[in-house]
Every structure is written in C-alpha cells, then in structure tokens.
C-alpha cells in the first residue's frame, strides 16, 4: 500500500516537472534598486500597498529620501468600472473592472533604466440587483486581486532589467 502511494506521488511530481511547473520565487531585482523611492499616484491605494510589499519581499528597501535611491515612478494608477452587458429589462447584468498602471524606473542619477511601461488587467462579474451586498463584495475582491496581480507584474518586469 505504501509503495502504491509512493509511486502515485512520484508520478505526480514527474508530471508537474515535465509540464514546467515550478514554485514562484521572489524576483531578483537589479542591485541599483537596493534603495528605492516609490513615487506613485494614489499612494494609499491597494495597488501601492501591494507594490511596496512585493518590493520589500524582493529585498528592496523602500525609502522616502532621494539620496542615492533609485526612483520607481508610477504616474498612472487608475481603476474604472464599466458596464459590460445589459439585460432584456434594460438593467445592468455585468460590469467590467479595469485597472491600468504605468511605471518607469530611474537610476539615482536620473537616467532612465526602464522606460515608461503600461500594464492593464480587467475582470468581468455578474451583477444581481437582488443581492447588492454580494456584488459589492465581489467588486472589492476583484479590485484587490487586480491590484495584487499588477503589483506582481511590475516587480517581475523590474526583475528583467539587464537580462
């Protein structure tokens, strides 16, 4: 019985390895980013908090002073809600949430390391006017998920500098 379990476990591990699966590790960011100042529109947004967390998890010391620090500029950090579809009774059935982020990385001397980049993600969710509280919770969950995904994308992109 133990040998069957062991064989099954081994088969699963081989299949996962064969398909290219690997655990996500922290991004290796350029050494110039050891100290980084974050200049972001909406500094108290969910995206800003998630970006700072992911940067710190990757070994970046996020600072407020400019002396000797790289600058990560995020001039655009915008979320908008759009009507996706309308039902037969002329009422909204689905919404789309779009989150757009633009960023660029400057060295401590002001030279551009990564030019302005734009990332955008969106999610669609159904709206039920009979259950407005659930729709609000889903809206909030999707906004947080988009913010986290975009923050991860930005950090991964920063990790490609010089490669």
What are these regions (language model features)?
Residues 15-18:
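C-terminal motif of bacterial Sec signal peptides marking the signal peptidase cleavage site
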Residues 32-78:
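N-terminal segment of the mature soluble domain
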Residues 48, 52-55, 98, 116, ...:
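Extracytoplasmic/secreted envelope proteins and their assembly/folding machinery
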Residues 133-163:
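C-terminal/domain-edge helix-coil "capping" segments
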Residues 55-59, 105-109, 153-162:
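Sec/Tat-exported extracytoplasmic proteins
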């Amino acid at each position: 019985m133990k040998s069957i379990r062991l064989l099954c476990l081994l088969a699963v591990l081989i299949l996962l390895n064969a398909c290219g699966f690997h655990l996500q590790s922290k991004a290796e960011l350029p050494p110039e980013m050891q100290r980084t100042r974050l200049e972001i529109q909406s500094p108290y947004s969910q995206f800003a908090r998630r970006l700072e967390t992911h940067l710190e998890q990757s070994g970046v010391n996020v600072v407020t002073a400019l002396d000797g620090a790289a600058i990560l500029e995020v001039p655009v950090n915008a979320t908008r809600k759009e009507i996706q579809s309308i039902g037969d009774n002329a009422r909204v059935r689905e919404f789309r949430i779009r989150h757009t982020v633009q960023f660029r990385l400057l060295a401590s001397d002001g030279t551009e390391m990564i030019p302005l980049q734009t990332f955008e993600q969106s999610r669609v969710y159904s709206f039920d006017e009979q259950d407005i509280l659930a729709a609000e919770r889903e809206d909030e969950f999707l906004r947080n998920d988009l913010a986290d995904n975009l923050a991860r994308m930005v950090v991964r992109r920063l990790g490609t500098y010089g490669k």
